[in-house]
Amino acid sequence: MNAFGVDISRWNIKDNVTPDWSTIKASCNFIAIRSGVSWGYTDNWFTHNWQGAQGMCRMAYHVIYFGEDATKQMDAMFKIVPGDWKHDRLVLDLEVHGGNSKAKITSTTRDCMNIIRSRTGMYPILYSRASWVNQYLDVKGLPDADWWLAQYK
């Protein structure tokens, strides 16, 4: 299935101008909204964007730092993201290796996935680039998951 969606975070918002939600809703199948990074950063536009995208298929994505504690990072994400896990999905953004080993990256990813599963009843979607996954992650060491692979043009 081909679906078109957009990724939105404070980086996409210029001069504090609110996104045009009617245009986004008319042209997209889903929207991915950044909630934060690791355990200590909240995207300051998340709540506004999450509310603006109400009625769409929404995904909240959280950037994981592999050298940090998985529970602490997931606690931070769940403080940011309100949950309606019947319709909305959580995404782990896997793209900053930080010099960690493949084993550490895989174990932290697995731990985060299992925490999300225990709190929501489903595994998160995993977001990355295929080349990054091939270089830094042992996919066989993870539970089955849906993938969102970036394709930059």
Place the predicted regions along the sequence by residue.
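Solvent-exposed loop/turn segments at secondary-structure junctions
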Residues: 10-14, 36-40, 64-69, 95-100, ...
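Short catalytic-loop micro-motif centered on adjacent basic/acidic residues
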Residues: 7, 60-61, 125-126
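Alpha-helical scaffolding within the catalytic cores
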Residues: 11-23, 41-52, 68-83, 132-136
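Boundary/entry segment of secreted carbohydrate-active catalytic domains
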Residues: 1-38
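Surface-exposed substrate-engagement region within the catalytic domains
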Residues: 22-29, 74-153
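Residue-identity detector for glycine
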Residues: 5, 36, 40, 52-55, ...
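Alpha-helical structural elements
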Residues: 6, 16, 45, 122, ...
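Short, well-structured secondary-structure segments
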Residues: 29-43, 50-67, 89-91
